[in-house]
């Protein structure tokens, strides 16, 4: 029992430390309330093709031991808001609020990057899932491509990192599930270059690898936009 309590306390302390570090890093340059999702992360000077060439290529590791709680037991906090509401606040427009400080988004409009549809978000038991927060690099995909070797604080940062989070159409997100670029790309072809570049940026940041099929799929997309830059994050 003492050993279990010690492990539980260490995990909680680690989570608090990770949350504090994440909040400090993010709020040193607070993201505006209304930002077009296609440019939510400022571009670096690095071409996506060059960044892709530096990613390790390996096979997918077994999913053995995977549990989302090994990343974060629910959304972490970014300042006064949880990560879900932080992303809704960043990606939606014409927002109304349910509380103060302005954390819980009541209504808003999403220009969905995955489908190019305009979605009217209304918070509610039967309506909230119309807009979901997608991990651009899926959590289980990360687990099978390097995250098993990361510390809890690194996995926590990955799970709650705005670079890897995007408000999107709920059905499109469920269709994607835990797919990588080899098996799923946004139906909106106009967003595919940005999508792939962001996946590459996340994988580079957290030292995750790609499979050969995934690398090839990314390369095919980037042939249509050879000057695409990876986002900063």
Roles of regions detected by a PLM:
Residues 27, 38-81, 85, 212-214, ...:
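N-terminal module-boundary/linker segments of secreted carbohydrate-active enzymes
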Residues 105, 114-233:
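Domain-level detector of nuclease and nuclease-like folds
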Residues 4, 65-67, 91, 138, ...:
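Short, solvent-exposed coil/turn linker segments
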Residues 2-38:
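Secretory targeting and sorting signals
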Residues 60-132, 136-137:
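Secreted/periplasmic proteins that engage bacterial cell-wall peptidoglycan
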């Amino acid at each position: 029992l003492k050993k279990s309590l010690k492990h539980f306390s260490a995990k909680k302390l680690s989570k608090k430390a990770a949350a504090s570090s994440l909040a400090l890093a993010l709020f040193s340059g607070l993201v505006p309330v209304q930002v077009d999702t296609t440019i939510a992360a400022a571009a670096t000077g690095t071409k996506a093709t060059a960044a892709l060439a530096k990613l390790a290529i390996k096979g997918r590791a077994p999913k053995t031991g995977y549990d989302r709680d090994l990343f974060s037991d629910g959304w972490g906090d970014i300042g006064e808001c949880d990560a879900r509401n932080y992303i809704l606040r960043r990606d939606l427009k014409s927002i109304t609020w349910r509380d103060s400080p302005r954390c819980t988004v009541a209504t808003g409009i999403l220009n969905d990057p995955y489908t190019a549809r305009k979605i009217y978000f209304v918070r509610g038991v039967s309506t909230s899932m119309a807009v979901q927060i997608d991990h651009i690099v899926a959590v289980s995909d990360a687990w099978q491509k390097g995250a098993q070797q990361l510390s809890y604080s690194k996995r926590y940062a990955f799970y709650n990192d705005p670079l890897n989070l995007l408000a999107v159409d709920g059905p499109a997100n469920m269709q994607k599930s835990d797919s990588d670029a080899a098996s799923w790309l946004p139906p909106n072809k106009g967003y595919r270059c940005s999508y792939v570049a962001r996946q590459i940026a996340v994988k580079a940041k957290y030292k995750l690898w790609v499979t050969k099929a995934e690398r090839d799929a990314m390369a095919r997309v980037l042939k249509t936009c050879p000057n695409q830059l990876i986002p900063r994050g």
